[in-house]
Amino acid sequence: MKIGPPWLTRFERARIIGIRALQISLGAPVLIQVSEELSDPITIAEKELELGLLPIIVVRWTPEGKIQEIPIKYLKLRPQL
């Protein structure tokens, strides 16, 4: 990774979870087994992200205009504070 840290920032994590939760609430197929305790779209999206199942690419850029596309499977998840 040439741009940014080797982990998902809290802003990237929030955006990914929000986008995926919206997709799930609109009827997108879920990538994990859903139980009664995992019925909330946000909880499902968080679990999918933790398991590394989301085929999403994070785009990072600098003020100079350089862009780097990074699949989230190459980014580490930081523990929640």
Swiss-Prot record:
Keywords in alphabetical order: Cytoplasm, DNA-directed RNA polymerase, Nucleotidyltransferase, Transcription, Transferase
InterPro entries registered for this protein in UniProt: DNA-dir_RNA_polK_14-18kDa_CS, Pol_omega/Rpo6/RPB6, RPB6/omega-like_sf, Rpo6/Rpb6
SMART domains per record: RNA_pol_Rpb6
Keyword field contains Ion transport: no
Swiss-Prot/TrEMBL catalytic activity: RNA(n) + a ribonucleoside 5'-triphosphate = RNA(n+1) + diphosphate
EC number(s) on file: 2.7.7.6
Biological process annotations from GO: transcription by RNA polymerase I; transcription by RNA polymerase II; tRNA transcription by RNA polymerase III
Localization annotation: Cytoplasm
GO cellular component annotations of the record: cytoplasm; DNA-directed RNA polymerase complex
GO MF entries: DNA binding; DNA-directed RNA polymerase activity
Top-rank EC class of the record's enzyme: transferase
Domain of life: Archaea
Subunit and interaction comment: Part of the RNA polymerase complex.
Function: DNA-dependent RNA polymerase (RNAP) catalyzes the transcription of DNA into RNA using the four ribonucleoside triphosphates as substrates.
Family: Belongs to the archaeal Rpo6/eukaryotic RPB6 RNA polymerase subunit family.
Alphabetized NCBIfam families for the sequence: PRK01099.1-2, PRK01099.1-3
Name listed for the protein in its UniProt record: DNA-directed RNA polymerase subunit Rpo6
